[in-house]
Amino acid sequence: AKNIRVIRFPAWEPIHNYPLPSPSPKFFRMLFLLRRERPDIVISRTRFFATSLLALAYAKARGIPLVHIEHGSDYASFNGSIKTFLGKCYDHVFGWIVLRFADRVIANSQASASFVKKLSGRDAMVIYRGTKTQIIEQCVPDQKTVEAYRGKTIIAFIGRLIDGKGTRDLITALARLERTDIVTFIIGGGPEEAHLKKMTTKYRLENQVIFFGNLPFEKALGILKTADVVVNPSYTEGLPTSVTEAALCRKAIIATDVGGTREVISGSGDGFLIPPRRPELIAEKIRYLLDHPDEREQLGKNAYAEVSEKFSWDRASDHYIEILSGLAENKKKHR
């Protein structure tokens, strides 16, 4: 894109997907060069990433307003109680600092705003992020996939394969179903993929669970559009993009009632909301939708009606422009 410059600093990952700046000469040279830049606003996203703390330090050192955008609605969930405890400790120190000292905090859901209040004691403005509605509307189901699995009812999951997404519960639910008339698509990649494949082997589901890995957005969407039911079994969410996209694809949705999911679908006629970590309930709802195709179709239509007007990039952009312009103007007045 024009007028966008990406600067990538060297990093290492003590925990997968949570990079820390590498204290190398290259990193410190880049920090020094950033002193020449004259931004009007600094923006950080999600308080438990080290980049948010780095953005805060840079903004305060330069006297530049910091806008923090929070996506999380709970403490980070890790595979292991020790990691989860350490993550919570990090949040109560460094996450709190980011949220308390940012000039403005924006949350992408009411659930995220509630968590900001809980962790830091301050209020956050809610701006729902938009969706690529036009692209989703124009995308057609992948015809090769349609032909390959004709006659099967298709269940789909789309998202990162990390512990917090609860994908193990979906595999466990499929094992409980013992149905041969379905196939399940896992669209996305991540550190959980190897373990999930072992689970499918253990439960003899190798021919019923298809792993697509990471795909370009439109290709992934084409696969998603072939599905009859979309399952989002997450343990924690801010505002789940996958649920929003599934609704815009007019799919019947089974999702865990966590974070901002209830702000996408209500669970009353537009999909099923269930508690997290309950694979038996996932199996129960899938079985119901398999046996009631007409209701499955109606749930998808209702979900689309709920979401199509609510998540608009035009509306979100207007809010952001108003906030950023106001902060930049205020900064100029106080120079």
Q: Whereabouts are the PLM-identified features?
A:
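Conserved acidic donor-binding segment of nucleotide-sugar-dependent glycosyltransferases
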Residues: G267-S268, F272-P279, Y288-P293
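Short hydrophobic beta-strand element within catalytic cores of glycosyltransferases
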Residues: A252-A255
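Carbohydrate-associated surface elements
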Residues: A111, G130
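Conserved donor-binding/catalytic core segment of Leloir-type glycosyltransferases
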Residues: A148-L174
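Acidic anion/phosphate-binding donor-loop and adjacent secondary structure
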Residues: T131-E147
